Each structure stands twice: as structure tokens, then as C-alpha cells.
Swiss-Prot record:
Modification sites for Phosphoserine: S106
Molecular function per GO: guanyl-nucleotide exchange factor activity; translation elongation factor activity
Organism expressing this protein natively: Gallus gallus
Classification via Pfam families: EF-1_beta_acid, EF1_GNE
Keywords: Elongation factor, Phosphoprotein, Protein biosynthesis
Organism superkingdom: Eukaryota
SUBUNIT field: EF-1 is composed of 4 subunits: alpha, beta (alpha subunit of the eEF1B subcomplex), delta (beta subunit of the eEF1B subcomplex), and gamma (gamma subunit of the eEF1B subcomplex). Interacts with elongation factor EEF1A1.
Lineage of the species this protein comes from: Eukaryota, Metazoa, Chordata, Craniata, Vertebrata
Biased composition (Acidic residues): 96-113
GO cellular component, one term: eukaryotic translation elongation factor 1 complex
Function: Catalytic subunit of the guanine nucleotide exchange factor (GEF) (eEF1B subcomplex) of the eukaryotic elongation factor 1 complex (eEF1). Stimulates the exchange of GDP for GTP on elongation factor 1A (eEF1A), probably by displacing GDP from the nucleotide binding pocket in eEF1A.
Post-translational modification: Phosphorylation affects the GDP/GTP exchange rate.
Alphabetized SMART domains for the sequence: EF-1_beta_acid, EF1_GNE
Protein name as annotated: Elongation factor 1-beta
Length: 225
């Protein structure tokens, strides 16, 4: 199991395809599996790998809570497609040009002609299969918790500020006020986003910019549509 080399373009493509129908590396909530792969990736994937980028931005929003996420962090070879070997950090690509792609992680310095032919054939089949997939617009449903400073905050004005945020690929949905204690209520608001256009980081940055009303914003739920 694995994703190949997550520091390479080929490895990120494997991760992107793996996440095409998944919100998380394992299960239905963020876990230590996501943290292990997130740390191995190390930087946001390219914009054209929108499944991987959507996942990366979502897991990044759990930076402060990552130690408390469920599960046990395992080796990268314990995650991902069963037919791909993990080679991240193995040094297999250190002596190669960045353009060299080793999707299936050969350990031999000198590949036989037959092994090279088979590897290139499998890579071509992989690229062909991916190219035939229809270009779908990936969307996610996000539930946000927006917390005010205190019980005197004008929550109607706070919601008005949040809904004033407009972006291509962002649609606001229903909302409600939820008591959190000491007379304070938080705004819980639903939105649907196009993953390659709107991320949780962007939403947090713009919502918390209304600092007269907003103390913080958290992602309460994130589901791929």
C-alpha cells in the first residue's frame, strides 16, 4: 500500500485519484491517518489536483487539534491504494531529475529493459484511464461554527457580515443560533463550495476579518457531495 513518492507529481496524482470519492484517508472523520499523509505531502498540491488540494486545505484547518484527532499514526505504507508502494522519503528520487517518474518505486539502480517497459506500460495505462474520466465539478457541504466575542454581540449583524462574503463557487445555506453557555450563542451556518475554487482557509480568513463581531470560526462538519 502507499501513494508512491508524495514529494513527486506522480505520487500526488495517485493521492488525488484516491481522494476522488473520499473525504478522508481512512473512515469518515479526520484522523491520524490524514495527519500522517498531510505531513508527508508538506505543501499544497497543484490546483489541477483539486481532490488532493481540497483534502489538504481541510486537514490544514485542524492544525491546532491534530494531536487530539482519533487513531494511531502509522507508516505511510499502511495507507492508500493496495497496488502502489510507498517510496516517500526513501531517497529513490534524490539522484534522479525531477522529471523522472517512478510510480511503482523500483529499488534497482539499473532497471532491466523488461522492467522498464512494464513500468512505462503501467504508467501509460494509468494516465490513459485518468484522462478518460469525465471532468466533474467536485463540491463539498460545509457546516461552520462562527463564535462571537460575548453575549452582547449583535448576532443578526454577524450573520449579515458572513453572508456578505461572495465568491465564485460559494453558496450559503440555512443557519441557526446555538447556545454555547453564559448567554452566548454561536452562529451555525451551512454552505456548499466548489472544491477547486473555495477552501476553508479562505472562508476563515474572510469571516474572521469581521473582528468587531467574530471571535473565531471552526469547521463543524465537512462532507463531499
Amino acid at each position: 500500500m502507499g501513494f508512491g513518492d508524495l514529494k513527486s507529481a506522480a505520487g500526488l496524482r495517485v493521492l488525488n485519484d484516491f481522494l476522488a470519492d473520499k473525504s478522508y484517508i481512512e473512515g469518515y472523520v479526520p484522523s491520524q491517518a490524514d495527519i500522517a499523509v498531510f505531513e508527508a505531502v508538506g505543501a499544497p498540491p497543484p490546483a489541477d489536483l483539486f481532490h488532493a488540494l481540497r483534502w489538504y486545505n481541510h486537514i490544514k484547518s485542524y492544525e491546532k487539534e491534530k494531536a487530539s484527532l482519533p487513531g494511531v499514526k502509522k507508516a505511510l505504507g499502511k495507507y492508500g491504494p493496495a497496488d502502489v508502494e510507498d517510496t516517500t522519503g526513501s531517497g529513490a528520487t534524490d539522484s534522479k531529475d525531477d522529471d523522472d517518474i517512478d510510480l511503482f518505486g523500483s529499488d534497482d539502480e539499473e532497471e532491466s529493459e523488461e522492467a522498464k517497459r512494464l513500468r512505462e506500460e503501467r504508467l501509460a495505462q494509468y494516465e490513459s484511464k485518468k484522462a478518460k474520466k469525465p471532468a466533474l465539478v467536485a463540491k463539498s457541504s460545509i457546516l461552520l461554527d462562527v463564535k462571537p466575542w460575548d453575549d452582547e454581540t449583535d448576532m443578526a449583524k454577524l450573520e449579515e457580515c458572513v453572508r456578505s462574503i461572495q465568491a465564485d463557487g460559494l453558496v450559503w445555506g440555512s443557519s441557526k443560533l446555538v447556545p454555547v453557555g453564559y448567554g452566548i450563542k454561536k452562529l451555525q451556518i451551512q454552505c456548499v463550495v466548489e472544491d477547486d475554487k473555495v477552501g476553508t482557509d479562505m472562508l476563515e480568513e474572510q469571516i474572521t476579518a469581521f473582528e468587531d463581531y467574530v471571535q473565531s470560526m471552526d469547521v463543524a462538519a465537512f462532507n463531499k457531495i
